[in-house]
């Protein structure tokens, strides 16, 4: 049987068929029942500066106040740990989304309402994550803010650096952003307040029976 060394130096079987799935004694439905909620993944996508983290954070705060069990995965935060080994090449960006998708799936399996805030510029990558989850459990949330508004905000100074050529392949400037064609939730973040956007999200969750109480 062929062997290969992993990153820690341990020998592993090279063939993936030697890895089997271990079934849990407590399943997803039981975890969700204990939490009295329906698991879901809300995937916030949009340009840098669109307001993804702001709206997702405000929504999580509101859901927590209502007694729901949540977790917010933020694009910057995961690059301090889980994805700290990745850069910003197309390949690394895709791997970044793949890892977050798998993590979000595990958190959903734990019965949580998962919120993620990532630019995730390509439709194929967002579809890749949707395909990981049961039908109706992935909600694409488009934080719909124009490039002009995002660039005017420029909270991290990234657009200025991109325009100056200090950052290459920056989404919206010299790298394309593929806006969702039919998002589950379309947030006009350049026109409404954060509170209004949160209310829109809560209503959408209630309509899908993901939450029962939100007023």
From Swiss-Prot:
Kinase as UniProt keyword: yes
Catalytic residues (positions): 120
Known pathway: Sulfur metabolism; hydrogen sulfide biosynthesis; sulfite from sulfate: step 2/3
GO MF annotation: an example: adenylylsulfate kinase activity
EC number(s) on file: 2.7.1.25
Gene Ontology biological-process entries: hydrogen sulfide biosynthetic process; sulfate assimilation
Classification via Gene3D superfamilies: P-loop containing nucleotide triphosphate hydrolases
The UniProt record lists the keyword Endoplasmic reticulum: no
Pfam families: APS_kinase
Keyword list, A-Z: ATP-binding, Kinase, Nucleotide-binding, Phosphoprotein, Transferase
Entry function: Catalyzes the synthesis of activated sulfate.
Protein name per Swiss-Prot or TrEMBL: Adenylyl-sulfate kinase
Organism: Vibrio cholerae serotype O1 (strain ATCC 39315 / El Tor Inaba N16961)
